[in-house]
């Protein structure tokens, strides 16, 4: 049986009037089908606990799909029902970093993933 892989591209976007607001993600992940991956999004230039962090998926040639969001102050989450069993959103307030864990990966999970404030 041949080796197969899933490629996840990670992109960060930030909104707001302050140009120093930054969201930093690793460039790409290469993972095996059936495995899980934890994507990170490190925030700087604003009060991390005061803004919702959203996660969005875009497959090649397709539109954006909202996965869910998390409020870092109390870790309240909302999920698109489609991703309820796929994605788990968490934060580490001490490092101002948001995380999204994707489980049971398949070829359908090969996409660009955005974190956005």
UniProtKB/Swiss-Prot annotation:
Region of interest (Complementarity-determining-1), ranges: 50-54
Entry keyword set: Adaptive immunity, Disulfide bond, Immunity, Immunoglobulin, Signal
Disulphide bridges: 41-115
Ranges for region Framework-1: 20-49
Ranges where the record places region Framework-3: 86-117
GO cellular component, one term: extracellular region
Designated name of the protein: Ig heavy chain V region 3
Organism for this UniProt entry: Mus musculus (Mouse)
